[in-house]
C-alpha cells in the first residue's frame, strides 16, 4: 500500500452555525449521512454547541476526504455518500456508500481520518491509501 493522496480542511464553527440557522436545519440534512445525522441530533439535544461542533467536524471531514481522493465534491463523491463515524474508543473512521463505495473498492482505496475541534474551528486530516500500482498511476510515476 502507498499513499494515494492527502487532504486537510479547516472549518469555522460559527460559519457552520450561521448556515445551519439560515437554512432552518436543512444544511445538516443535506451534508450528513443517516448515521451522522442521528448523532448530530442527539448531541444537539444535549448541547447546541456540541451539536454544531459535530456538524463542523463532519463537514470538514468530507471536504478533506474529497481532496485526498482527488475528486473534490464531484461524482461519485457526494456529501451523504461518506460518513465519519466513531469506534467505541472514540477513534474516527470513514464509511462510504453507494457509487462512492464502488469507486473506492474498484481502486482498492482506503482512508485514515482524524478530526478535532476547538472553540471556533474544526480541522480534519485524511490519508488515502491504495495498492502501489494505483497510487503510482495517480502520481504519474512509472509502475
UniProtKB/Swiss-Prot annotation:
Cofactor annotation: Mg(2+)
Major location category of this protein: cytoplasm
Keywords, in A-Z order: Cytoplasm, Fatty acid biosynthesis, Fatty acid metabolism, Lipid biosynthesis, Lipid metabolism, Magnesium, Metal-binding, Transferase
E.C. designation(s): 2.7.8.7
GO molecular function: holo-[acyl-carrier-protein] synthase activity; magnesium ion binding
Highest taxon of the lineage: Bacteria
Gene3D superfamilies noted in UniProt: 4'-phosphopantetheinyl transferase domain
Key word ATP-binding present: no
Binding sites annotated in the UniProt record for Mg(2+): 9, 63
Function noted in UniProt: Transfers the 4'-phosphopantetheine moiety from coenzyme A to a Ser of acyl-carrier-protein.
Family assignment from sequence similarity: Belongs to the P-Pant transferase superfamily. AcpS family.
Name of the protein described by the UniProt record: Holo-[acyl-carrier-protein] synthase
Amino acid at each position: 500500500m502507498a499513499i494515494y493522496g492527502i487532504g486537510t480542511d479547516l472549518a469555522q464553527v460559527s460559519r457552520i452555525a450561521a448556515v445551519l440557522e439560515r437554512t432552518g436545519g436543512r444544511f445538516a440534512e443535506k451534508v450528513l449521512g443517516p448515521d451522522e445525522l442521528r448523532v448530530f441530533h442527539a448531541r444537539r439535544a444535549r448541547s447546541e454547541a456540541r451539536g454544531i461542533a459535530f456538524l463542523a467536524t463532519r463537514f470538514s471531514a468530507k471536504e478533506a476526504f474529497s481532496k485526498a481522493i482527488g475528486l473534490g465534491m464531484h461524482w461519485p463523491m457526494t456529501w451523504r455518500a461518506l460518513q465519519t463515524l466513531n469506534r467505541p474508543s472514540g477513534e474516527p473512521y470513514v464509511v462510504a456508500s453507494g457509487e462512492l463505495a464502488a469507486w473506492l473498492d474498484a481502486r482498492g482505496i482506503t482512508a485514515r481520518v482524524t478530526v478535532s475541534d476547538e472553540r471556533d474551528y474544526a480541522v480534519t486530516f485524511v490519508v488515502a491509501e491504495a495498492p502501489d500500482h494505483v497510487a503510482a498511476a495517480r502520481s504519474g510515476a512509472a509502475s
